[in-house]
């Protein structure tokens, strides 16, 4: 291009004669998240502009629990959702969702076992009513805790609930005697002086992770969008690890948990996208339990599709051959 042509083009642009370049079309992606911190990377990716950078129009719906967020995939209310390992693994067998990546490791201590004051050791739980958030990771933690501490689940009465606040209210009213709780539920369930924290989820001896999954149909129809989402979440993971205080501000502005609670909860998670031996070991432990309880075999090989993360963040896939 000659200098005179460039100058003429610049003059036309300055005078408004050249049409503005159209913005790149964004792909709409419907996300399902819980009301606490499992969706941390999604909120950060939205607020920091990482989705925009990757051409994603994020449409985020908050559900009471991760279970509901995952179920939204199965009924067509979400394209991608995040959740902890147990509810994710227990819903794979229908083939309607693909697990794409681990999004964080859960370090011990997130769930606290709150019990009535008359319960002093695990054996005291026999004959008691124990609340669970049915189908969640807390459900599995409860069962594994009992088994690890010599208490058969058959020796207690399991009472199912659909939300943390239901569990808290039932503890305080005496409807149940014990339950693993989390987030602000710990303080709310012990402030009456009639309950205390006996232990935390480390006593269940599980390797916990959270995952992001996509509806199988969406992943097959829009694989580029799935890869773009994973790239955005990888950026968000790095931001959270380096800026926990600011991340807590962002996450709390979108969730039901107070800012200080969110900041504390972030300390129980190591945020990074990954598919490696850690994720596989944790997945296998959950799938063994699911296969036993549902009489349906669930495996890492059939439930996880590493191809999307391999394209998005190759270094994040470290599975042994």
Where are these regions (language model features)?
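Secondary-structure end/capping motifs
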Residues: 220-296
């Amino acid at each position: 291009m000659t200098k005179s042509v460039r100058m003429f083009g610049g003059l036309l642009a300055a005078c408004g004669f050249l049409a503005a370049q159209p913005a790149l079309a964004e792909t709409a992606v419907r996300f399902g998240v819980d009301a606490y911190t499992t969706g941390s990377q999604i909120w950060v990716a939205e607020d920091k502009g990482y989705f925009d950078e990757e051409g994603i129009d994020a449409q985020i719906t908050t559900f009471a629990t991760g279970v509901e967020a995952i179920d939204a995939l199965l009924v067509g209310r979400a394209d991608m959702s995040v959740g902890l390992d147990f509810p994710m693994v227990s819903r794979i067998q229908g083939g309607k969702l693909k697990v794409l990546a681990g999004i964080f490791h859960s370090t011990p201590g997130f769930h606290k076992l709150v019990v009535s004051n008359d319960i002093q050791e695990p054996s005291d739980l026999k004959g008691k009513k124990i609340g669970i958030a049915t189908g969640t990771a807390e459900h599995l933690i409860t069962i594994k805790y009992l088994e690890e501490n010599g208490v058969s689940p058959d020796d207690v009465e399991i009472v199912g609930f659909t939300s943390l606040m239901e569990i808290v209210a039932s503890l305080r009213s005496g409807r149940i005697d014990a339950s693993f709780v989390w987030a602000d539920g710990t303080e709310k369930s012990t402030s009456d002086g009639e309950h205390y924290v006996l232990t935390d989820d480390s006593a269940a001896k599980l390797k916990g992770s959270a995952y992001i999954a996509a509806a199988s149909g969406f992943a097959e129809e829009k694989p580029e969008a799935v890869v773009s989402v994973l790239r955005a979440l990888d950026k968000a993971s790095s931001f959270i690890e380096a800026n926990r205080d600011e991340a807590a501000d962002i996450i709390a502005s979108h969730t039901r948990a107070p800012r200080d609670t969110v900041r504390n909860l972030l300390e129980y998670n190591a945020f990074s996208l990954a598919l490696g031996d850690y994720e596989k070991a944790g997945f296998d432990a959950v799938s063994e339990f699911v296969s036993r309880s549902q009489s349906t075999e669930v495996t890492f090989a059939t439930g996880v599709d590493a191809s999307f993360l391999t394209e998005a963040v190759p270094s994040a896939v470290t599975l042994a051959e």
